Amino acid sequence: MYSPIPQSGSPFPPTVKLPGLHIWRVEKLKPVPVAPENYGIFFSGDSYLVLHNGPEELSHLHLWIGQQSSRDEQGGCAILAVHLNTLLGERPVQHRESQGNESDLFMSYFPHGLKYQEGGVESAFHKTSPGTAPAAIKKLYQVKGKKNIRATERVLSWDSFNTGDCFILDLGQNIFAWCGAKSNILERNKARDLALAIRDSERQGKAHVEIVTDGEEPADMIQVLGPKPSLKEGNPEEDLTADRTNAQAAALYKVSDATGQMNLTKLADSSPFALELLIPDDCFVLDNGLCGKIYIWKGRKANEKERQAALQVAEDFITRMRYAPNTQVEILPQGRESAIFKQFFKDWK
């Protein structure tokens, strides 16, 4: 079970309570602050804590798990999340975010979309800095989606391209936003915005950005990628966001540690649920895993062990139910319930 770091050894600064966005990369059980100019860049081999403090003490704490992050890093991220949540008086709603399956709320913090880069902590130490010669940079990113646009690093080759998406070819001093003939307008706008963001945040504004239409590739692109072959066709269906609001695909469980171990008791196997089932003395699992999400509701009078074990309970539940590892998790303190959570219950105003 994840346990908090002693208060006397808090690795978080007092500024953690200030409004706005705070991001840390987890490194050897320590939170390493991410510079604001690098917000939205995530290394696939790492885990991150993302805290957003909004108005009226409305906070959301996200654990972002990279596809290639180690179990140790993920465990360290969970331990730090428990500590940070306690430090903030257990006010934040907690979310577990998996690379490529982030929540809409998480995506809203990054108007230019996300950029995934290969590697982990070691790669982060050697990434481009203001003193690095930009001419040495050669990276390719695929920009894909309709509602939530993400940029993912790809192999530097025409084989990575298709006609249905947009791609960013970052050559340091020149940044090309290439738009496939069948790409959608949202992808094109995001590709342009992300290319400009790379220029401004990573090149201090000293790079040339060019929007490239499929079939009108400049010589610099051909020089790096070679002669352009016939490209794969894009699949517009892949860009559709699945509807995750089917309230019937749900079940409600009560969490108890009365025996010294965390046990689950099913209270109802279909929604809408009776609101009276949620009592302040306990924690509950709302299983909407078939639609990609698990909720943990923490009663304000539940014991500390149950409250702090919420994330572990969710992860064990996902494993037990054989749901996808990237299933989203949302942990809600009593009084911080979202509208989506409330829709599973009868007459919750």
Curated annotation (Swiss-Prot):
Q: Which Gene3D superfamilies does the protein's record reference? A: Severin
Which InterPro entries does the entry mention? ADF-H/Gelsolin-like_dom_sf (IPR029006), Gelsolin-like_dom (IPR007123), Villin/Gelsolin (IPR007122)
Q: Can you supply a Gene Ontology BP term from the record?
A: central nervous system development
Location of N-acetylmethionine modifications: 1
Q: Which residues form a coiled coil?
A: none
Keyword list, A-Z: Acetylation, Actin capping, Actin-binding, Cell projection, Cytoplasm, Nucleus, Phosphoprotein, Repeat
Report each Gelsolin-like repeat as a residue range: 27-75, 149-189, 262-308
Family according to the record = Belongs to the villin/gelsolin family.
What is this protein's name? Macrophage-capping protein
Organism encoding this protein = Bos taurus (Bovine)
In the record, what lineage is assigned to the organism producing the protein? Answer: Eukaryota, Metazoa, Chordata, Craniata, Vertebrata
